[in-house]
Amino acid sequence: MLSTKWLAIAASVLVLLAVGCRGPMPVYNVTDAPVAASKPSPSLDEVGKAIQRAGVALGWQMKETKPGHMLGTLVLRTHVAVVDVNYSVKSYSIRYKDSTDLGYDGQNIHPNYNGWVQNLDKGIRAQLSLL
């Protein structure tokens, strides 16, 4: 009985190590995702506001720099992620712009960054579906 307990503990430790030791991964970008709104033709302003709502709800600071472009910044402790969000009435893209303390090497980045961008993408899709 004791050996089964130790085997279970050892297996749990190995799983935690495997999950916790993920190395850098390729940067996740979203390219030309369709604007899937419930109404036929949302305006550029409506698309921008939906993107802004999605980002703010997830803790991103979303700043419109010009019509069709936003700069998204997420600050979590010492980590900073900055993305360009380009959008039109038909599609949007989320692209890596800059980061701090995420180990970006020109191609790869800390895996948490990818999760944050994937969550932003999901949030944008959800907000756009409400238009």
Predicted regions and their residues:
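Hydrophobic helical h-region of N-terminal Sec-dependent signal peptides
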Residues: 9-15
